[in-house]
Amino acid sequence: MFKEFKEFAVKGNAVDLAVGVIIGAAFGKIVTSLVNDILMPPLGLLTGKMDFSNLFINLSGTPVDTVAKAKAAGIPTINYGLFFNNIIDFVLVAFSVFLVVKQINRLRRPETPPPPSTRQCPFCLSPIPLAASRCPQCTSAVEPTAT
């Protein structure tokens, strides 16, 4: 049983997954800081520090001012303001991740395409293998190309 666990733990997929989760958690902290510390302050200035967190529907009829007071009193509420805040947070985080990934992808070197394995027959324009000496479509004799 230990041998099976050892094989599982050191397999490439399990190790790659562990590294991905660890890097993802660290990257999540960077994105959260980007949103909270860099993007939200100017956005707060533009929107007049708009906060939807105290927008709710009281389901009991007992008057309360805030969601916190309703929760403390055990009053059922539909907290649509918190939902809006979470939607705004998600959109900002998703857009921030998009921008960061876009910049990372710009730094990557483009992959070189593999060399072609076919060429065009000069007579019928059909694709033929590079080493072919005769076109299989029109049966014309062609010079083989060095591979």
Swiss-Prot record:
Membrane topology, record value: Multi-pass membrane protein
A single GO cellular-component term on record: plasma membrane
Keyword annotations: Cell inner membrane, Cell membrane, Ion channel, Ion transport, Membrane, Transmembrane, Transmembrane helix, Transport
InterPro entries with a match to the protein in the record: MS_channel (IPR001185), MSC/AndL (IPR037673), MscL_channel (IPR036019)
Membrane-spanning segments: 15-35, 81-101
Pfam families for this protein: MscL
Ranges in coiled-coil conformation: none
Superkingdom of this protein's organism: Bacteria
General function of this protein: Channel that opens in response to stretch forces in the membrane lipid bilayer. May participate in the regulation of osmotic pressure changes within the cell.
Family, as annotated: Belongs to the MscL family.
PANTHER family, A to Z: LARGE-CONDUCTANCE MECHANOSENSITIVE CHANNEL, MECHANOSENSITIVE CHANNEL MSCL
Protein name: Large-conductance mechanosensitive channel
Gene source species: Geotalea daltonii (strain DSM 22248 / JCM 15807 / FRC-32) (Geobacter daltonii)
